[in-house]
Amino acid sequence: MFAIIETGGKQLKVEQGQEIWVEKLNAEEGSTFTFDQVLMVGGETVKVGSPVVEGATVTAKVEKHGRGKKITVFKYKPKKNYKRKQGHRQPYTKLVIEAINA
């Protein structure tokens, strides 16, 4: 059984037992988090929501919080002595999908 959920402005296909990394969620490590924005549930029969499937939820356990790889943003304008260098690390949350309830 699989489901398509929406979180952090992105849509993800998830299955039970799968590990996923999503945009940072306000949840404690070791706690459970429930996704209500379930767009589709598949298995023997497929349920497609418009826009969400009524009564469907996906439950996940919060493994840890972390930060992604560092990216460098560099702005430069030639002949004007303008240079700006800035780094960024996106925060994320690692989840393990426990159950898909449809």
UniProtKB/Swiss-Prot annotation:
Gene Ontology CC: one annotated term: ribosome
UniProt KW keywords: Ribonucleoprotein, Ribosomal protein, RNA-binding, rRNA-binding
GO molecular function, one term: structural constituent of ribosome
Pfam families for this protein: Ribosomal_L21p
One GO process term, biological-process aspect: translation
Cell cycle recorded as keyword: no
Cited InterPro entries: bL21-like, bL21-like_sf, Ribosomal_bL21, Ribosomal_bL21_CS
Claim: Nucleotide-binding is one of the keywords in the record: no
Function of the protein: This protein binds to 23S rRNA in the presence of protein L20.
Subunit structure: Part of the 50S ribosomal subunit. Contacts protein L20.
PANTHER family hit by this protein: 50S RIBOSOMAL PROTEIN L21, LARGE RIBOSOMAL SUBUNIT PROTEIN BL21M
Family stated for the protein in its record: Belongs to the bacterial ribosomal protein bL21 family.
Name of protein: Large ribosomal subunit protein bL21
